[in-house]
Structures are given as C-alpha cells and as structure tokens.
Amino acid sequence: MKWEENVRKVVPYVAGEQPNRPNMIKLNTNECPYPPAPGVRKAAENMESAALRLYPNSNAQPLVDELAAYYGVKPEQVFVGVGSDDVLSMAFLTFFNSGKPILFPDVTYSFYDVWADLYRIPYHTCALDENWHMNPEDYKQPNGCVIF
C-alpha cells in the first residue's frame, strides 16, 4: 500500500456536538470562560506588534536552550512541538513502533485512533464500564503501549 492510499483511508475528524447558543462555553473545544490573567494582558499590551506578523524561530532554539539549561540536559535531549497534536504525532512515530497493538479506552481523546491509522500502528480500544471506569484486566494482554 502506498502512503497516499493510507492517508486517503483516514476518517476525517468530526467534532462532537457544537451547540450554538449565546453565552455557552464549550469546554470540550478548550474555550475558557475567564479573561486573560492580568500578567498575560500586560505582556500582550507591551508586545511589539510587528512580532505578531512573523513566524517564531522554527526550531524554538531559544526555548530549547532555556529548557535544557533549567533541567540540566543537552539541548539535543529536548523536544518542543508546535502544539499537542504535533507532540502526540511525534510520540506515536517514536514510541509505538513495536508492531504490537497499543491499547486505550474507547472513550478518550479522539485523535489516538487517527494517529494510529495514519502511521499504521495496530490498536485496540477497551470499553469503560457503566460507571466510566477502566477494567485493569482489559489491559493485561501483550501490547506495545497503554495510553490512559
């Protein structure tokens, strides 16, 4: 199978219910009911507006260097992504390549199966019980990883 064929088989993400009512805060899409903290507001006001027109350093080197110094590691040991989906994508490519299925609950972050399908990583979902609890016995099987 060609890579392109594999991508075409990925089922597009479909957002959950998106009610359109006034004053509704949608926590499932990371909306926040609170205004920015005073320090954030002040930093935004003091920011040079020209900086907003430009992309940041593509490899986040200043941030990587600061994190490496803070944690006492080499910069090569620090990974910085451009959002949680980027970090998860890299984690799937890096850690879940044993050929064994990864396991995760059937009610979870909706992109786990998308990444698994895209990168041809076998997976198995484990049902939650009627009280939304995981059954540890479901995870006692050969696997490449368990995601909670």
Model-derived regions: residue spans:
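N-terminal "arm"/small-domain region of PLP-dependent enzymes with the aminotransferase-like
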Residues: 1-54, 140-142
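Phosphate-binding glycine-rich loop
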Residues: 61-101
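Conserved PLP-anchoring active-site segment centered on the Schiff-base-forming lysine
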Residues: 94-115
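Short beta->alpha connector loops at strand-helix junctions that form conserved
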Residues: 106, 125-130
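A short helix-loop-beta submotif of the ANL/AMP-binding
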Residues: 119-123
